[in-house]
Amino acid sequence: MRKTVFVLLLLLMVLPAPARRKPRYPFIRADLNVLQTPGGESPELQHFFRKLDTLLITGRGDVRVLHVGGSHVQGGTLSDRLRRHFLSLRYGMEGGRGLVFPFSAAGTNTPVSYSSSWQGNWESATCLKPADEELGLTGMAVMARDTSAKVILDLVPRERQLLQQRYVFNRVDVLGSGTLEPILLLNGRDTLRGIGTENLRHFDIPYYTDWIQLAFTGQGRYSLRGLYLDKPYGGFSLSEAGVNGASTHSWLRCGLWEQEMHRVMPDLVIFSIGINDIQGDDFDARRFKGNYRELIKRVRRVNPRCAILFSGINDSWRHRAVNRHTEAAEKAFRELAQEFDAAFWDWYGVMGGAGSMAKWEEAGLAQADKIHFTPAGYKLVGDLLFDALMDAYYGR
């Protein structure tokens, strides 16, 4: 029996790496599609890879990724593409769905991988400007003023695919605070009360589900900063935290960001913040790096062995011309990667460099604003980034 198990494990270890996709577009620089580690081999990235080894070979363990950014992340297509690629590496290794937020109650778009709806009276706050509300890992909050407020979260993706991944959970952590008490309505009617602290309420649902309805009881108000959906066993999970228009300075406004990151405890944080930092006339690379230093310190205080991956930023246009700050930001990313033993993916270079956003637009991959991508474009970016990650993983 032991010999059989050993042979099976050995076969898993020598399986060939997934075939790299050949770029269908001549403007993509496949030769640049690698993870750069300017500071030399990253111990934290190697630790992440070893945890992934354990999960892929034995089916055991817990691997968690957090993707942080602006509208590129809030839209959800890029993050979900990465999530699906990781889960395709081994059947049945999906962990909990992770961090979610009722974006519809805030009057903004929900990531494509789930849907949200709301009832009652809600107000909202984001990290884009100073707010009276405490903000955390999602960078947003919605405030319930009375018991008429309800939200429903459904994990069935709005974008249906042939091989549909189904995410189920039976553990819910509600991130928020207030005098109203959050409750779950099971099957739309039975009340489930949670336990917890001032800033977190934990619920154990007696069955697996892919949707929940959150309501409130009592008097007063409640500030809801997000929910974490999980299972009692391990696996791979990727949580996204994206706020349209958010810059590095925006995320520093989130005073509970570090505290709530303990709930995710990421092994890898992918930072896709930067495109909004370069939209003004006064981009300051030193300030940009200083903001990132503080964000990274907060991550490493939660998990000192957490790997950091800077995705860089894409080519973009401003005032009908190529944004001249992009290359300065790219240089800053490389310097940060060297300073923190992090990895850097040259999104700007891989997509074709200066002016390439116009070519992506012509190919139906970018929007007319030459800042954002189409769904097909975000999927392609996800494919390219995942290929670079897997080349680094299998090329050790």
Residue positions per predicted region:
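Active-site segments of SGNH/GDSL-like serine hydrolases
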Residues: 270-276, 297-330, 346
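Hydrophobic h-region of N-terminal signal peptides that target proteins for export
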Residues: 9-18
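Alpha-helical scaffolding within the catalytic cores
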Residues: 40-55, 251-262, 290-298, 327-331
